[in-house]
Amino acid sequence: LDVVDRWRNEREAGTRLTFAIHAGGTTVGGAELQPRGETAELAWWLYAGHRGSGHATRAARLLVEHAFSDLGVRRVEAKVDPRNVSSQRVATRSGLRREGVRRLEPGMAERDDATGMVVYARLISDPPISEPEGFRALLNSFLPRKRAISQLLVRDHDGRVLICRLTYKRDWDLPGGVVEVGESPQLAASREVQEELALDLLAGPLLLTDWLPPWGGWDDAVCLVFDGGAHDAGIADQIRKQAREIREAEFATLEQVRERCADFTARRIESALSNAESGGGPAYVESGG
């Protein structure tokens, strides 16, 4: 009842604009806009038996244009339950770009069991989705994105591999890190090694692509291992550790790698090392191989 009273008061005050969706001579659903300054929140619903025919998409498109042209807002947004796949399609087809997921505690949304809402929005300055630039930007907002990690396989002339003990986990790993948005993975490997170890090493050819399944709170990722070349063991004396991330760094035998690294990391190092020594093309493995 409190919700109904609030909606009634908002309608009377003009802060909640409700519209009926008509099709084929009957009312098939509704939609509403809630202007708040330069932003308006958009919502829609369809009655059973009238879904899947494009009615909600057309209504949403019309209300977005109405908000921009008649209400003076500069941003229209919609919050959609991530379990509601059809409403997510409506948001996308009406030209709203996916911006992210707003996390919620149970009881904070209209459905008490919702733990998040997907935020979609369109700005008045966004190119129309009828234009190539606008359509590409729309697709780019919701298509899957996969994290990329670049690492460098650095060896000495005895076949040992440079590994690091990190501050944020117990096991050792190859030097490297997450590729920044828009950054070349090959350049990222060299950048990370310079930042973490103060070594200026060029990343050579790709040795291994390793898909990492979700693990320990991380989403899945792709790890790219590049050839860092073979060097004199004395290069380790030039290392200046980035204390925030690196505890130790040293050359290790394969036996030491197996003892110090997680099993999948050890498998990845062995796969990359085998490929570097054989001179074969880059290999693909999953969880180290």
Listing of model-derived features with the role each one plays in the protein:
Residues S69-K79:
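Conserved GNAT acetyl-CoA-binding A-motif
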Residues K79, G95-M117:
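Conserved catalytic-core motifs of GNAT/GCN5-like acyltransferases
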Residues A20-H22, A43-A56, V80-D81, V178-V181:
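A short, internal acetyl-CoA/4′-phosphopantetheine-binding micro-motif in the GNAT/acyltransferase core
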Residues V119-L153:
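Acidic, metal-coordinating catalytic segment for phosphate/diphosphate chemistry
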Residues D81, D156-E195:
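Conserved Nudix-box catalytic region and its N-terminal flanking loop in Nudix hydrolases
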Residues V179-L202, D210-T265:
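Unchanged
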Residues L46, G52-S69, V85-R93, P185-S190:
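Conserved acetyl-CoA-binding loop-helix of GNAT-fold acetyltransferases
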Residues R170-D171, Q242-G289:
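Nudix hydrolase/Nudix homology domain
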